[in-house]
UniProtKB/Swiss-Prot annotation:
This is Indole-3-glycerol phosphate synthase. Pathway: Amino-acid biosynthesis; L-tryptophan biosynthesis; L-tryptophan from chorismate: step 4/5. Its EC number is 4.1.1.48. It comes from Dechloromonas aromatica (strain RCB). The keyword Lyase applies. Pfam families: IGPS (PF00218). It catalyses: 1-(2-carboxyphenylamino)-1-deoxy-D-ribulose 5-phosphate + H(+) = (1S,2R)-1-C-(indol-3-yl)glycerol 3-phosphate + CO2 + H2O.
Amino acid sequence: MSDILNKIIATKREEVAAARLAKPLAIVEAEAIAQPAPRDFVGAIRNKIANDRPAVIAEIKKASPSKGIIRPDFQPADIARSYEQHGAACLSVLTDRQYFQGCPEYLQSARAACALPVLRKDFMVDAYQVAEARAMGADAILLIAAALTLEEMQALETQASAYGMAVLVEVHNGEELDAALQLKTPLLGINNRNLRTFAVTLETTLGLLSRIPAGRIVVTESGILKPEEVALMRTNKVNAFLVGEAFMRVPEPGAELARLFA
């Protein structure tokens, strides 16, 4: 596959420029400030781990650039309730329209249907999107190290923190990890999927663990499909997981969560 990440980021910058014209940043910021306090995303993950349970960030995703439509019958509220009933710590909801067929309304619908903290899963490149995330009710945002400079990540993290939102910073290699470790967030996502080629290997997480200092919560992302893979990660003291596609492809996502993380 071609370098899809660069393509997505270019599209995202165009979308933000158009959004700023349609609704000025000051209006979005006012909407963000008017929201009720965010739910505690980091706390929800820590609580699971403290109780010796895997902390699952369960994803709600209709489609992807590499797989096309993943879940034709897509009901975010029903999926959110199913995840909550079966032990998820948090939700991750795709809001990117063009490549993942997501939207802010999916996040709002999912969040309203449960009490779980919700991550806005999107490609954040601009302060506008952070304000937008809080305005739509998100409790956390994702920062992808492959798409941002350290200075950009620090600025977006500072803004998210001012709104009370958590930050999950995502890396795929050592260079990205070095940058991510300069942020304040305890949440460090290691994506086993290379966003430039979409190839997946769990060795990505395992290979970076020795470089991560104590106090960080490692979230392994992508490629967790079997209970043995969960066990492998937990043996290596990785107790937080972001899983989406494995759940989206079955009729009852929450039941699959319970089976995978039994």
